[in-house]
Regions:
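N-terminal signal-anchor transmembrane alpha helix of single-pass membrane proteins
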Residues: 1-38
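Generic preference for well-ordered secondary structure
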Residues: 9-12, 16, 55, 110, ...
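Residue-identity detector for glutamine
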Residues: 22-25, 38, 46, 72, ...
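Short secondary-structure junctions
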Residues: 36-41, 85-88
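Short extracytoplasmic
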Residues: 39-56
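Structured extramembrane domains adjacent to transmembrane segments
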Residues: 57-170
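Short acidic DE-rich linear segments
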Residues: 178-185
Length: 185
Protein backbone atom coordinates (compact mmCIF):
# COMPACT_ATOMS: atom_id res chain seq x y z
CA UNK A 1 0.00 0.00 0.00
CA UNK A 2 2.83 2.39 0.86
CA UNK A 3 4.58 1.60 -2.42
CA UNK A 4 1.36 2.28 -4.32
CA UNK A 5 0.95 5.68 -2.63
CA UNK A 6 4.60 6.50 -3.30
CA UNK A 7 4.18 5.66 -7.00
CA UNK A 8 0.94 7.61 -7.14
CA UNK A 9 2.76 10.69 -5.84
CA UNK A 10 6.00 10.18 -7.81
CA UNK A 11 4.77 9.28 -11.33
CA UNK A 12 3.31 12.74 -12.14
CA UNK A 13 6.68 14.29 -11.24
CA UNK A 14 8.37 12.25 -13.96
CA UNK A 15 6.29 14.06 -16.58
CA UNK A 16 7.44 17.44 -15.22
CA UNK A 17 11.11 16.67 -15.86
CA UNK A 18 12.15 18.10 -19.25
CA UNK A 19 13.56 15.72 -21.83
CA UNK A 20 17.00 16.27 -23.35
CA UNK A 21 15.35 17.64 -26.51
CA UNK A 22 13.30 20.12 -24.47
CA UNK A 23 16.45 21.24 -22.65
CA UNK A 24 18.28 21.76 -25.99
CA UNK A 25 15.34 23.74 -27.36
CA UNK A 26 15.23 25.88 -24.22
CA UNK A 27 18.95 26.66 -24.57
CA UNK A 28 18.51 27.49 -28.25
CA UNK A 29 15.52 29.75 -27.54
CA UNK A 30 17.43 31.49 -24.78
CA UNK A 31 20.31 32.08 -27.18
CA UNK A 32 17.83 33.42 -29.74
CA UNK A 33 16.65 36.03 -27.24
CA UNK A 34 20.29 37.09 -26.77
CA UNK A 35 20.57 37.38 -30.58
CA UNK A 36 17.60 39.83 -30.63
CA UNK A 37 15.17 37.20 -31.91
CA UNK A 38 11.71 36.67 -30.54
CA UNK A 39 10.55 33.05 -30.33
CA UNK A 40 6.88 32.07 -30.19
CA UNK A 41 5.15 28.72 -30.40
CA UNK A 42 2.68 29.02 -33.26
CA UNK A 43 0.25 26.89 -35.20
CA UNK A 44 0.14 27.03 -38.98
CA UNK A 45 -2.34 25.35 -41.33
CA UNK A 46 -1.52 21.77 -42.23
CA UNK A 47 -1.75 21.84 -46.00
CA UNK A 48 -1.29 18.09 -46.52
CA UNK A 49 -4.09 16.80 -44.31
CA UNK A 50 -6.01 13.87 -45.73
CA UNK A 51 -9.78 13.40 -45.47
CA UNK A 52 -9.60 11.36 -42.26
CA UNK A 53 -7.79 14.24 -40.53
CA UNK A 54 -10.11 16.97 -41.83
CA UNK A 55 -13.43 15.46 -40.68
CA UNK A 56 -14.02 13.76 -37.34
CA UNK A 57 -16.21 10.68 -36.84
CA UNK A 58 -19.34 12.84 -36.49
CA UNK A 59 -18.67 14.51 -39.85
CA UNK A 60 -17.67 17.84 -38.29
CA UNK A 61 -14.86 19.73 -40.01
CA UNK A 62 -11.67 20.20 -38.03
CA UNK A 63 -9.03 22.82 -38.63
CA UNK A 64 -5.75 20.96 -39.10
CA UNK A 65 -2.71 22.71 -37.69
CA UNK A 66 0.99 22.04 -37.18
CA UNK A 67 2.82 23.28 -34.10
CA UNK A 68 6.09 25.04 -34.84
CA UNK A 69 8.47 27.62 -33.41
CA UNK A 70 8.48 31.07 -34.99
CA UNK A 71 11.91 32.69 -34.84
CA UNK A 72 11.28 36.36 -35.57
CA UNK A 73 13.45 39.40 -36.12
CA UNK A 74 11.90 42.85 -35.67
CA UNK A 75 12.32 45.53 -38.31
CA UNK A 76 14.14 48.72 -37.32
CA UNK A 77 10.83 50.57 -37.66
CA UNK A 78 7.33 49.46 -38.68
CA UNK A 79 7.00 48.97 -42.44
CA UNK A 80 3.45 50.05 -43.15
CA UNK A 81 3.40 48.78 -46.76
CA UNK A 82 4.15 45.20 -45.71
CA UNK A 83 0.97 43.12 -45.38
CA UNK A 84 0.81 39.92 -43.38
CA UNK A 85 2.26 37.24 -45.68
CA UNK A 86 2.53 33.58 -44.75
CA UNK A 87 4.51 31.62 -47.33
CA UNK A 88 3.81 27.96 -46.56
CA UNK A 89 5.73 24.84 -47.46
CA UNK A 90 3.66 22.08 -48.99
CA UNK A 91 5.42 18.71 -48.90
CA UNK A 92 5.06 16.59 -52.01
CA UNK A 93 4.00 19.73 -53.91
CA UNK A 94 0.36 19.34 -52.78
CA UNK A 95 -0.71 22.98 -53.03
CA UNK A 96 -4.43 22.19 -52.62
CA UNK A 97 -5.99 25.57 -51.83
CA UNK A 98 -2.84 27.62 -52.22
CA UNK A 99 -1.43 29.88 -54.90
CA UNK A 100 1.92 28.48 -56.01
CA UNK A 101 4.89 30.82 -55.54
CA UNK A 102 7.81 28.40 -55.86
CA UNK A 103 8.25 24.66 -56.19
CA UNK A 104 6.60 23.25 -53.04
CA UNK A 105 5.79 26.69 -51.57
CA UNK A 106 2.68 28.83 -51.81
CA UNK A 107 0.44 31.45 -50.24
CA UNK A 108 -3.27 31.33 -49.51
CA UNK A 109 -4.30 34.87 -50.53
CA UNK A 110 -3.99 36.85 -53.74
CA UNK A 111 -2.69 39.92 -51.84
CA UNK A 112 0.20 37.86 -50.43
CA UNK A 113 1.03 36.62 -53.93
CA UNK A 114 0.97 40.15 -55.39
CA UNK A 115 3.14 41.58 -52.61
CA UNK A 116 5.91 39.03 -53.21
CA UNK A 117 5.66 39.14 -57.02
CA UNK A 118 5.89 42.96 -57.08
CA UNK A 119 9.11 42.98 -55.04
CA UNK A 120 11.59 41.32 -57.38
CA UNK A 121 14.55 41.46 -54.97
CA UNK A 122 12.61 39.69 -52.21
CA UNK A 123 11.05 37.24 -54.68
CA UNK A 124 14.44 36.30 -56.18
CA UNK A 125 16.04 35.94 -52.74
CA UNK A 126 13.23 33.66 -51.57
CA UNK A 127 13.39 31.62 -54.77
CA UNK A 128 17.10 30.92 -54.22
CA UNK A 129 16.69 30.43 -50.48
CA UNK A 130 13.75 28.04 -50.48
CA UNK A 131 15.34 25.65 -52.95
CA UNK A 132 18.07 24.76 -50.44
CA UNK A 133 16.91 25.84 -46.97
CA UNK A 134 16.75 23.32 -44.14
CA UNK A 135 13.85 20.93 -44.74
CA UNK A 136 12.53 21.60 -41.22
CA UNK A 137 11.50 25.17 -42.17
CA UNK A 138 7.73 25.14 -42.68
CA UNK A 139 6.92 28.78 -43.42
CA UNK A 140 8.28 32.27 -43.96
CA UNK A 141 6.23 35.08 -42.45
CA UNK A 142 6.26 38.81 -43.16
CA UNK A 143 4.39 41.48 -41.21
CA UNK A 144 4.73 45.23 -40.81
CA UNK A 145 6.63 44.66 -37.54
CA UNK A 146 8.88 41.65 -38.19
CA UNK A 147 10.11 38.85 -40.41
CA UNK A 148 9.96 35.24 -39.26
CA UNK A 149 10.92 31.67 -40.06
CA UNK A 150 8.64 28.98 -38.69
CA UNK A 151 10.18 25.56 -38.22
CA UNK A 152 9.67 22.30 -36.39
CA UNK A 153 12.96 22.42 -34.43
CA UNK A 154 13.66 18.78 -35.25
CA UNK A 155 17.25 19.57 -36.17
CA UNK A 156 18.28 21.90 -33.36
CA UNK A 157 21.99 21.83 -34.16
CA UNK A 158 24.20 24.90 -33.96
CA UNK A 159 24.74 24.97 -37.74
CA UNK A 160 21.01 25.01 -38.49
CA UNK A 161 20.40 27.73 -35.89
CA UNK A 162 23.18 29.90 -37.34
CA UNK A 163 21.79 29.39 -40.86
CA UNK A 164 18.33 30.52 -39.75
CA UNK A 165 19.69 33.60 -37.98
CA UNK A 166 21.72 34.54 -41.07
CA UNK A 167 18.68 34.10 -43.34
CA UNK A 168 16.54 36.25 -41.04
CA UNK A 169 19.14 39.03 -40.98
CA UNK A 170 19.49 39.02 -44.79
CA UNK A 171 15.74 38.95 -45.30
CA UNK A 172 15.23 41.77 -42.79
CA UNK A 173 17.82 43.99 -44.50
CA UNK A 174 16.47 43.18 -47.97
CA UNK A 175 12.86 43.89 -46.95
CA UNK A 176 13.75 47.18 -45.25
CA UNK A 177 15.78 48.31 -48.30
CA UNK A 178 13.02 47.27 -50.71
CA UNK A 179 10.32 49.05 -48.73
CA UNK A 180 12.50 52.17 -48.53
CA UNK A 181 12.54 52.23 -52.33
CA UNK A 182 8.74 51.76 -52.48
CA UNK A 183 8.21 54.52 -49.89
CA UNK A 184 10.26 56.99 -51.93
CA UNK A 185 8.24 56.39 -55.12
Amino acid sequence: MIIFLFLLAFVPLVYAIPTSKQRRQARMRKRASHDALQVEIRFIPKMTADASEIVNTEGVLREMKIECAAYQLAFSKPLLNVPHVLLLKSPENRLNSMIKMFDGWGVRKEAEFRYLKERAAIFNFLQDLLSNINEDVLAVEFSSQRIGLLWGEKDDSEAVYLELVEVLKKLKTLTEETELIYDSE
